[in-house]
A protein has these predicted regions:
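Alpha-helical scaffold segments that form or flank carboxylate-/histidine-based iron centers
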Residues: 16, 49-58, 87-93
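Short, solvent-exposed positions on alpha-helices
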Residues: 47, 65, 82-85
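Amphipathic alpha-helical segments within well-ordered protein domains
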Residues: 36, 54, 71-75, 89
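C-terminal structural segments of small proteins and small subunits
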Residues: 85-109
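Iron-sulfur (Fe-S) cluster-binding segments and ferredoxin-like electron-carrier domains
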Residues: 29-30, 69-81
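Short, thiol/selenol-centered motifs that function as redox-active sites or metal-ligating centers
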Residues: 53, 57-69
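Acidic, glycine/proline-rich low-complexity segments that act as flexible tails and inter-domain linkers
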Residues: 1-49, 102-117
Length: 117
């Protein structure tokens, strides 16, 4: 039986990301270097808000890895669970029940990190 821990999934996701970076170094350098550096920095919009915006987009795009990554990075930048759920509510307002079902991935992640009950 497969372990359904979202935190174990996150660890595996980062391991596979590192593995693919070594197989595609030029693309990885461009994408994880200059492209991300140009976007994910403080500017007119602060970095935490950009990560929350990215979370809403990840929910809409149905990208599980992106949802986990953006939630993790938003938390590292000081986002509260309230801010994360408010971000989810924006995504849900645009995407309906499909987005709601994807926001459950975020809730599961927060629960496993023991940030919510």
């Amino acid at each position: 039986m497969m372990d359904d821990s979202i935190l174990k999934y996150e660890d595996r996701m980062w391991q596979l990301t590192d593995a693919t970076k070594t197989k595609m170094p030029e693309l990885a350098d461009a994408y994880y270097g200059s492209v991300k550096d140009a976007v994910y920095r403080d500017g007119s919009i602060d970095l935490k808000t950009k990560r929350l915006m990215s979370l809403a987009i990840a929910i809409q795009a149905d990208c599980k890895d992106c949802m986990i990554s953006q939630t993790s990075k938003a938390l590292e930048l000081g986002a509260t669970t309230e801010e994360i759920f408010e971000t989810c509510s924006v995504a849900i307002s645009m995407g309906g029940t499909l987005a709601w079902s994807k926001a459950l991935i975020v809730a599961d992640y927060l629960r496993e990190k023991e940030l919510i009950e």
